[in-house]
Amino acid sequence: MEEDHPTTYRFDPKTVALIGKYQSREISESLSLLARELERRGLTVIVEKSTAESASSPEFERWARCDFAGIGQRADVAIVLGGDGTMLNAARQLAHYCVPLVGVNQGRLGFMTDIARS
């Protein structure tokens, strides 16, 4: 009965985009772990093009790469690993597409990226 309630919202993403702070070794490792876990759960993973290019791992070759326009057209949700600046950039780039963002804080203090990496 709860499913019929007008405020109930079911979100069942199939494609997840990963966006990370460029040139960050720690984020490359976290993105790789996250991508593998998402795949294990049956989700399609795409990685933002510049994030993949700056990653130090050849493992990133296995996932599709997209620019922000491609993410906007293909992703059901985007997970942003970085700080508030990375989150603001992703939000600005994807605002036109209305892709929901989830921020994972990789820095010391995050106001918008409030989920801790651990």
Identify what each model region corresponds to:
Residues 53, 58, 63-118:
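Small-residue-rich beta-alpha loop regions that form the catalytic core of phosphotransfer
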Residues 1-77, 118:
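ATP/NTP phosphate-donor binding region
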